[in-house]
Regions:
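Switch/connector loops and helix/strand junctions flanking conserved nucleotide-binding motifs
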Residues: 44-47, 63-66, 126-131, 177-178, ...
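Short, surface-exposed connector motifs at secondary-structure boundaries
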Residues: 25-33, 163-167, 213
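Phosphate/Mg2+-binding loops and adjacent switch elements
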Residues: 82-173
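Glycine-rich nucleotide/cofactor/substrate-binding loop typically near the N-terminus or early
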Residues: 52-82
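Conserved beta-strand segments of the P-loop GTPase G domain that flank and frequently precede/overlap
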Residues: 9, 37-38, 121, 167-172, ...
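Phosphate-binding P-loop
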Residues: 1-3
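Walker A/P-loop NTP-binding active-site region of P-loop NTPases
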Residues: 6-64, 132-136
Length: 266
């Protein structure tokens, strides 16, 4: 895998956090230098520690201070600016600006360490669109100068070559897949090169679901299996990967099992 920044996004409740943690665990177990990032939210520390998943925590205001400190040459002055009501309000009134600052922080880490891979548990699909679209919008606003040059560097990383891979996570319903396809088209329109649709919580993708076991399913599950099988067949050209519905006692068990699918052992 050549991507340095692997993004998981999608509607709420599709399982992008589970998949992004499983991807991170898989890369770690294969010997990669990898960090899990939950954008501007803090991860489940207990879960990450239990699975020994390394994580990078970013907070919006701290990232803004760090960025200004790099430009001004003084962390103290940057902190003073951040504390002014105007700048603090501006940062929260323009969410796209905050997205750019955090994305810039991630890219800076990746550029400083060529061995590093970051798996991003992205905000929900609407915020993820803002995150990538904002690089174009703010570039038009500024036109030239220091921030304009930083945006150029950011876009070179995001939209040139194969450094970024975006996984649009969807559930196995026709409507959800249509929405995922629209989201994929939007990301490609922004300039992203590698955008995949991955299906999660798929009943037919359970390895143990043999024809003999399918025949023993209760009627409602048998119907669900048939519908999902038809959906997978109808959209097979659009779906890059499918992940099974898992019944485990804990999220940690599900992450550990799903990591095997990323590693190719399933």
């Amino acid at each position: 895998m050549s991507a340095r920044l692997i993004v998981f996004t999608g509607k709420g409740g599709v399982g992008k956090t589970t998949l992004s943690l499983a991807q991170t665990l898989s890369l770690k177990e294969s010997g990669k230098n990898v960090l899990y990032n939950n954008f501007d939210q803090f991860p489940n520390y207990g879960l990450c520690d239990r699975l020994r998943i390394p994580h990078l925590d970013l907070e919006l205001e701290e990232s803004a201070v760090e960025y200004m400190a790099q430009k001004l040459g003084s962390h103290m002055i940057a902190g003073w600016i951040m504390k002014t009501p105007f700048f603090s309000s501006l940062l929260h009134m323009l969410p796209g600006l905050g997205h750019i600052i955090i994305m810039g922080h991630l890219i800076n880490r990746l550029e400083k360490d060529p061995t590093l891979t970051i798996v991003m548990d992205s905000p929900s699909s609407g915020h993820a669109m803002t995150m990538f679209e904002s690089t174009h919008n703010f570039k038009k606003i500024f036109g030239s100068g220091m921030l304009f040059n930083d945006l150029n560097r950011m876009q070179d990383f995001l939209f040139s070559g194969d450094k970024v891979s975006v996984n649009v996570v969807t559930l196995p319903t026709e409507m959800a897949i249509h929405e995922a396809s629209e989201l994929k088209s939007a990301f490609l329109g922004f300039g992203l090169q590698d955008v995949k649709i991955v299906m999660n919580e798929s009943l037919p993708s359970i390895p143990e679901m043999t024809p003999e076991r399918v025949a023993l399913l209760p009627e409602f599950l048998s119907k669900k299996y048939q519908i999902e099988s038809q959906i997978i067949e109808s959209f097979k050209s659009e779906i890059t990967n499918t992940f099974p519905h898992l019944v485990n006692e804990s999220m940690a068990e599900s992450i550990t099992e799903l990591a095997k699918y990323f590693g190719g052992s399933k």
